[in-house]
Swiss-Prot record:
The lineage of its organism: Bacteria, Pseudomonadati, Pseudomonadota, Alphaproteobacteria, Maricaulales. One of its GO terms (cellular component) is plasma membrane. It comes from the Bacteria. Keywords: Cell membrane, Heme biosynthesis, Iron, Membrane, Metal-binding, Oxidoreductase, Transmembrane, Transmembrane helix. Catalyzes the conversion of heme O to heme A by two successive hydroxylations of the methyl group at C8. The first hydroxylation forms heme I, the second hydroxylation results in an unstable dihydroxymethyl group, which spontaneously dehydrates, resulting in the formyl group of heme A. Its cofactor is heme b. It is found in: Cell membrane. Heme binds at residues 259, 319. This is Heme A synthase. GO terms for molecular function: metal ion binding; oxidoreductase activity, acting on NAD(P)H, heme protein as acceptor. Belongs to the COX15/CtaA family. Type 2 subfamily. It comes from Maricaulis maris (strain MCS10).
Length: 341
């Protein structure tokens, strides 16, 4: 049966959507791991044997002893009990275990579809590249964790942003390739709004990365007022005593301010884009005229609520979930715009 058979393309498309759904779950669990300070509870990287959790009391004592050597424990959690350690351990273990599951869910069907001839040459190369990105993501995750096992209390915000950024790249490509598997590659001629949509997708991605810096620095726990930052448009401690270049990534005030203002810029861009889509004669992009503004309004509301409540876990995760939905919608819009000719 040829590649363009609807049965085979639907199967490949559905598989990639399952992978994308698992990546979404991975991002949410990763966010929970970060917000509960669970990320440093496993101090070793064992891709194979690490799949087996502690099975005896002695195993738990051994894992706890390793964690007790970290700066995070010695400075911040020295009163932690074994039961409390088990709580944070399970979050980090679950995060890593889901990563292993995603690897299996991706690799086994990938080999099957390849061997059965269900993939075009174009999709083979792209899906193999996506497989390599998944492997790199595991290494990036450990590289991030390792940054918190020295004299730091938390992992590096730079490495956290890299890890989250790669997760969204993998998510976006999974959805893009799923759409391509179902509908075929986009035409060589791009739609009129293709460039604008791609630019807006890039801006949303930048905003997500800025959110990672806010999370990495716990910058949402200060300036818990809105619309101003403790009464100021530009907070008094913007540079935090640093030069401009490191300050824009390391000053809590600067990082939060940039995340706020880029959010407003995303909203402005989305509403301008919706107006352009409204004027567009072709109907394929019309649903995004409603979907994108609704998601942006909801996301801004969640961000403000989380800030005013000093980033409780529930609102923070809802805000992260909103970012995932907005990103997915933007990927779908970008893909649709390339075909709207």
């Amino acid at each position: 049966m040829p590649y363009h058979s609807s049965t085979k393309s639907r199967a490949v498309s559905t598989w990639l959507l399952v992978v994308a759904a698992l990546v979404c779950a991975m991002i949410i669990i990763g966010g929970t791991t970060r917000l509960t300070d669970s990320g440093l509870s496993i101090t070793e990287w064992k891709p194979i044997s690490g799949a087996i959790p502690p099975l005896s009391q002695q195993d738990w004592q051994d894992e706890f002893a390793l964690y007790q050597q970290t700066t995070e424990f010695q400075v911040q959690n020295s009163a932690m009990t074994l039961d409390e350690f088990e709580f944070i351990f399970w979050w980090e273990w679950g995060h890593r275990q889901l990563g292993r599951l995603i690897g299996l869910v991706y690799f086994v069907p990938f080999v099957f579809f390849w061997m059965r001839g269900h993939l075009s040459a174009r999709l083979k190369s792209r899906l193999f590249g996506l497989f390599l990105l998944g492997g790199a993501q595991g290494a990036i995750g450990w590289w991030m964790v390792a940054s918190g096992l020295s004299d730091r209390l938390d992992v590096s915000q730079y490495r956290l942003a890299t890890h989250l950024g790669m997760a969204f790249v993998i998510l976006g490509l999974s959805i893009w390739f799923s759409l391509e598997a179902r509908h075929g590659p986009p035409p060589l001629r791009r739609g009129r709004l293709a460039g604008v949509t791609a630019g807006l997708l890039g801006l949303v991605f930048v905003q997500i990365i800025l959110g990672a810096f806010v999370a990495g620095l716990d910058a949402g726990r200060i300036y818990n007022t809105w619309p101003l930052m403790n009464g100021d448009l530009i907070p008094e401690g913007y540079l935090g005593g640093m030069n401009f270049f490191p300050a824009i990534f390391e000053s809590h005030a600067a990082v939060q301010m940039h995340h706020r203002w880029t959010g407003y810029l995303v909203a402005l861009g989305v509403f301008a884009y919706a107006w352009q889509v409204w004027r567009e004669p072709r109907v394929s992009l019309k649903p995004f005229m409603v979907i994108l503004p609704a998601l942006v309004i909801g996301q801004i509301a969640l961000g403000i609520a989380a800030l005013l409540a000093v980033v409780p876990l529930s609102l923070s995760l809802a805000h992260q979930a909103g970012a995932i939905l907005l990103f997915i919608a933007m990927v779908a819009a970008a893909w649709t715009a390339r075909r709207a000719v």
